[in-house]
Every structure is written in structure tokens, then in C-alpha cells.
């Protein structure tokens, strides 16, 4: 690009352009070197920054070598940041000497109305974040500590008072911008060199992390290791630089903690999505007794959790693997061991497990309903039995009384006998009339001892009366108590006590059967877990008959059996006593068929 390269070589001169062009306008042609107009127009030159008051002429015949969005200032190439509110004018000056002599002015931010709406700033996980709103009270939103003014945007929906950062007060806003730039030319420079307001082309990709940009002021983290979202560098997905004043920083290139954090988040997120899809398809979390819960987004000390999961693998072996149906005897190939499942999960990604009860598939809703019906039936039978006993006792007492009266009447003289009989009969009738309506439901208790009740209380108690649990013996004269809603007699207390005893006894028997089922199932799972963890060694033992048998060795000691048939695996029910086996079979029928429950009397 020498000065002596003729004007007609490249690009070719055009007479039309030369004739229609003014000959002497140095301010418009920016010819500060004294060259001819033809040379200045025909030479390709380096780009430069021109003041906004100067309007240069761009020749259509000169090819442009600069891209839009680039500006050159004093031989130093810098990239224009999209968030800077600057108005730049591109031109093709004639020579390099103009770069030295061109005046340099601080660009004035353009009005926000000239730019299109900015997209919402996305976080590290791609979630759009809401635009921050300012709360200025006394600055009229024309100071740098107003986030809207510092970012070059108008206040929109903010909580500010007496705001001038809007379209109506554009002249005042312009003056504030110019005054701020005179004091600090870099006032409107964003904190991050590659501002996130532009396209998120530098977003992190698993496998190849692209990290560009630098924090102009730096972060000041002290305890987070710069691996939390409140670290501005970490939130912007850039590495900490020399501008940062953080302590114990782990946000640098090659940091194992940062890589483990990113890759762990990605793998856990993908695993959880796959698990959720499988659960949606099958309609259940899983057939086993464990349902892995979704892993948290942020994990602290993954190595500690991994080691802890390995150490707890033996504890997980005690947890059963629950099948969909009721399990029978243990077999070696019927169901996989829960230890293999726990070990597989621990080796890939440590996750939490939700323990299911041993009785998860044993107790069914119809079993609970059957138990309730059985208890109600037992209570009703107990009430009837107690009532019958009371009636029988009362009849015996009446018979004895009549017998004694008859014998005493025979011993007295005949004259006095008639008068005594009349007096006795009258007395009995009077007592029956008095005690009948008042004490028919009290079983001989004095009516004066009964606590009087209000009509509202009596109505409520009558509504809640249960015919099964409140069976009262009829009075001898057949009368009915008009206030018979509150049992206060000794007989009713005995009935309730008997009902409670029988109900609790039946419920205790049911709980004992459930405990037996759980113990049997636990023994099955433990045997399967032991077989999976440590298969029994086979040793050759010579018996008394001279026949060599192979028996398992448990804990370093071989166990020999006299009968070869005992070496075969037996069902778990046979491990209990012979009396427990039929009881278990009958117990299963009791849960399914309530009427067939066998009543066990306490010793």
C-alpha cells in the first residue's frame, strides 16, 4: 500500500466518479497527507474510528476489508461488545497517516429505542432469568449504581421513584451519559468481557468446555471455592482471572472439582430423565424393594459419598427384594440378589434408596377389612355371651328366692300365712313398679347414684349408640329405660371389659402372625444375600459308612450330616418347629377368610 502505486492500477478509475466529485473538499475527503483526490479515493486503506460530527464518503468501488462490528483505534484491534451503547461509523480512509492524526472521542451511548429488545439472560442451566429491576429513590436513575442505566436500557416496570431513565427524559439522560463518560471512559463496560447479553454461543458443552471471556473486576469469593452460583465468574461460565480476589479458588482450567461437578450434573440429570421415562411407561417405580430417588443438582464431596455407598453395601444386603406376588421357598435362580443391585448403583452413580417394608406385598387391603370384620364379630359375640350369662345368673337367683319364700311360708301358721302372702305380693308389686322404669338398665343400682344428663347430651349419646357394643340385658318385667342411653351398671362394664379383652387378643394373634411372616421373609432374603456375597466352599467329608460327601463349609468349619437327604436345600417353613408349620398355613387362610378364624384362649 505504497504512496507511489498509480491511481489507475486497482481499482480502475472511472471518469464519471471523477467528474461528479467535488475537487476541493478536504474535510469531506479526509486527505490530511496532501495527496491528490484520485489517489485518496482509489487506494485501499486501513479502517479507523471517525468522530460522529464528520461524515466521510464511502466509495462503492473500494472493497471493504472490515467486518461489521469491528473498529480500529491507534493500531490496536478490539472487538465491539454488543452491550456497549456506542454508535460507530465505519469508513475507508485513504492512508495510515490518517490514523495518527484522526481525533479520538469517547463514543456516546445510543438511545435504547434504537436497539432491539435484548433476550433474557440465561443461566448456566439454560433457564431464562428475569430482568433485574432497580429501586432507585434519589438518583433519578441517572447514576451507575442504577442497573438499568449502567446496562444502557430504559427502566421498565422498576420500583424507582422520580425516574429520568425513559423516553420522555431522553435529553437529561444524554447529558448524564456524556458526563459519566468524561469522568470514566469505561463506565459502561460490562463486568464480563464477553457479555452474556449476546448469543449464548459460549455455553458449556459436556465433553468440550468452551470458556471465553474474563471478569473485568473479578470476584471476591472466600468459602465457596468459586463453584457456586453466587460467584459471578462461575455464573457467567468463565474461569477466574488475575482480576479476581477469591480464596481457595477451584474455578480454573484443569480443576478436577470443576470437571467432576459438570460431568456429575450431566450424568445425574440424564439418569434421572431416563428413570422418569421408564417409570412413566411401566406405571411404577420398580419391582424391587428399592426406588432410587432423583439425585440432587449439586453434590458436595462426591468421593465421600461414593466411599460411603461402598461401605454400606453390606448393610443394603439385609434389605429384602420384594416380589410382586407372595414369595414361596428360596431358590437360587428365582430372583436376583439385592446386593448386586446396590453394588451396581454404587459403582455408577451414588444414589439414595428408599426402604420398603417386609410386609409390603403380604398385607393387602382386603386383609385389613377382613380383620376389622372379624374384630366386630368377636365383639358382638362377646356381648351376647355376657348377656346370656347374666340372664342365667339372675334366673338362678330368682328361683332361689322363690324357693326360700315358699319354704318359709309353709313353716308359719295357716292364719298368718294368708296375711303374709298378701303383704309379700303387694310389696313385690310396689318394688317392681318403682324400680322398673328407673332401674331396668341399672341391674340393681340405686337410681339416686345415676348422674343426671341434659336432653342434648342424651340425644347425642343415643345417636352414637351401637347395637353390637351396647347390648343390654332386658329387665325381668320387660320394661324399657326411657333414658337408656348411658350404661352405668356393673353388668355393662363387665360386657365392655370382655369385649375389649377378646378384641385385643385377636389383634395380638394377628400381629404375631404378621411378625412370623416377616421373619420368614427376612430369613429368605438373608440367605440369598449370604449366598451372593460369599458362596459356600465345598469340602469332602468321609462319613461313618465310608461314603464321601461334599458338604458346605461355613465360617471355616465343615458341617456333616448323618443322612444324605438333609444336604438338599429345604424350604424355609421346615426350619421352624413342626407345630409352627401348620399354624402358618392356617394363618394364611385366616387373613383371607375371616369367618374361619380359630379362637385361641389365653392360658
Swiss-Prot record:
GO cellular component: nucleus
Polar residues bias: start-end ranges: 402-417
Record region (Disordered): 1-47, 105-133, 316-347, 386-417, 429-450, 584-603
Cellular compartment(s): Nucleus
Any one GO MF annotation of this record: DNA-binding transcription factor activity
CRC domain boundaries: 130-254
Tissues in which the protein is found: Ubiquitous but expressed mostly in flowers.
Organism superkingdom: Eukaryota
SMART domains hit by this protein: CXC
Location (main, coarse): nucleus
Keywords: Developmental protein, Metal-binding, Nucleus, Zinc
Compositionally biased region (Basic and acidic residues): 386-399
A Pfam family it matches: TCR
A GO biological-process term: regulation of DNA-templated transcription
Similarity-based family: Belongs to the lin-54 family.
Function of the protein: Plays a role in development of both male and female reproductive tissues.
Free-text comment on this protein's domains from its UniProt entry: The cysteine-rich domain CRC binds zinc in vitro.
Protein's name according to its UniProt entry: Protein tesmin/TSO1-like CXC 5
Native organism: Arabidopsis thaliana
Amino acid at each position: 500500500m505504497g504512496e507511489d502505486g498509480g491511481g489507475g492500477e486497482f481499482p480502475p478509475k472511472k471518469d464519471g466518479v471523477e467528474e461528479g466529485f467535488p475537487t476541493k473538499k478536504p474535510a469531506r475527503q479526509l486527505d490530511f497527507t496532501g495527496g491528490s483526490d484520485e489517489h485518496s479515493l482509489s487506494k485501499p486503506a486501513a479502517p479507523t474510528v471517525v468522530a460522529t460530527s464528520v461524515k466521510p464518503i464511502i466509495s462503492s468501488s473500494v472493497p471493504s476489508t472490515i467486518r461489521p462490528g469491528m473498529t480500529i483505534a491507534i493500531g490496536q484491534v478490539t472487538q465491539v461488545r454488543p452491550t456497549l451503547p456506542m454508535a460507530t461509523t465505519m469508513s475507508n480512509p485513504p492512508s495510515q497517516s490518517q490514523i495518527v492524526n484522526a481525533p479520538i472521542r469517547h463514543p456516546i451511548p445510543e438511545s435504547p429505542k434504537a436497539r432491539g429488545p435484548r433476550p433474557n439472560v440465561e443461566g448456566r442451566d439454560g433457564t431464562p432469568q428475569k430482568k433485574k429491576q432497580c429501586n432507585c429513590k434519589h438518583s433519578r436513575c441517572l447514576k451507575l449504581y442504577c442497573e438499568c442505566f449502567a446496562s444502557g436500557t430504559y427502566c421498565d416496570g422498576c420500583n424507582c421513584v422520580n425516574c429520568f431513565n425513559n423516553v420522555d427524559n431522553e435529553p437529561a439522560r444524554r447529558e448524564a451519559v456524556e458526563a459519566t463518560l468524561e469522568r470514566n471512559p469505561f463506565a459502561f463496560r460490562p463486568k464480563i468481557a464477553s457479555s452474556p447479553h449476546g448469543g449464548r454461543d459460549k455455553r458449556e458443552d459436556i465433553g468440550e468446555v468452551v470458556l471465553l471471556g474474563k471478569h473485568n473486576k473479578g470476584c471476591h469469593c472466600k468459602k465457596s471455592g468459586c463453584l457456586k452460583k453466587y460467584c459471578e465468574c462461575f455464573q457467567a461460565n468463565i474461569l477466574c482471572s488475575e482480576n479476581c480476589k477469591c480464596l481457595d479458588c477451584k474455578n480454573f482450567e484443569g480443576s478436577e472439582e470443576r470437571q467432576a461437578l459438570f460431568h456429575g450434573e450431566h450424568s445425574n440429570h440424564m439418569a434421572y430423565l431416563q428413570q422418569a421415562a421408564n417409570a412413566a411407561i411401566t406405571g411404577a417405580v420398580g419391582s424391587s424393594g428399592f426406588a432410587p430417588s432423583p439425585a440432587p443438582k449439586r453434590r458436595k464431596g462426591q468421593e465421600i459419598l461414593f466411599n460411603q455407598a461402598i461401605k454400606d453395601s453390606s448393610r443394603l444386603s439385609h434389605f429384602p427384594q420384594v416380589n410382586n406376588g407372595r414369595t414361596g421357598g428360596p431358590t437360587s435362580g428365582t430372583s436376583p440378589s439385592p446386593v448386586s443391585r446396590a453394588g451396581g448403583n454404587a459403582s455408577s452413580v451414588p444414589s439414595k434408596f428408599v426402604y420398603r417394608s417386609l410386609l409390603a406385598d403380604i398385607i393387602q387391603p382386603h386383609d385389613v377389612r377382613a380383620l376389622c370384620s372379624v374384630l366386630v364379630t368377636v365383639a358382638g359375640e362377646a356381648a351376647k355371651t355376657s348377656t346370656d350369662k347374666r340372664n342365667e345368673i339372675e334366673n338362678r337367683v330368682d328361683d332361689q328366692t322363690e324357693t326360700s319364700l315358699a319354704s318359709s311360708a309353709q313353716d308359719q301358721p295357716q292364719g298368718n300365712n294368708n296375711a303374709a302372702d298378701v303383704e309379700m305380693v303387694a310389696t313385690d308389686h310396689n318394688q317392681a313398679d318403682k324400680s322398673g322404669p328407673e332401674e331396668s338398665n341399672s341391674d340393681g343400682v340405686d337410681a339416686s347414684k345415676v348422674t343426671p344428663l341434659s336432653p342434648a347430651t342424651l340425644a347425642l349419646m343415643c345417636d352414637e349408640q351401637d347395637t353390637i357394643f351396647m347390648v343390654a340385658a332386658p329387665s325381668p318385667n320387660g320394661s324399657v329405660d326411657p333414658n337408656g342411653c348411658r350404661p352405668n351398671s356393673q353388668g355393662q362394664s363387665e360386657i365392655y371389659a370382655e369385649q375389649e379383652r377378646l378384641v385385643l387378643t385377636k389383634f395380638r394373634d394377628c400381629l404375631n402372625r404378621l411378625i412370623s411372616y416377616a421373619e420368614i421373609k427376612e430369613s429368605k432374603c438373608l440367605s440369598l444375600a449370604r449366598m451372593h456375597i460369599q458362596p459356600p466352599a465345598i469340602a469332602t467329608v468321609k462319613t461313618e459308612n465310608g461314603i464321601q460327601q461334599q458338604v458346605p463349609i461355613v465360617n471355616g468349619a465343615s458341617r456333616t450330616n448323618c443322612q444324605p437327604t438333609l444336604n438338599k436345600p429345604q424350604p424355609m417353613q421346615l426350619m421352624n418347629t413342626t407345630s409352627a408349620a401348620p399354624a402358618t398355613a392356617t394363618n394364611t387362610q385366616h387373613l383371607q377368610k375371616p369367618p374361619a378364624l380359630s379362637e385361641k384362649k389365653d392360658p
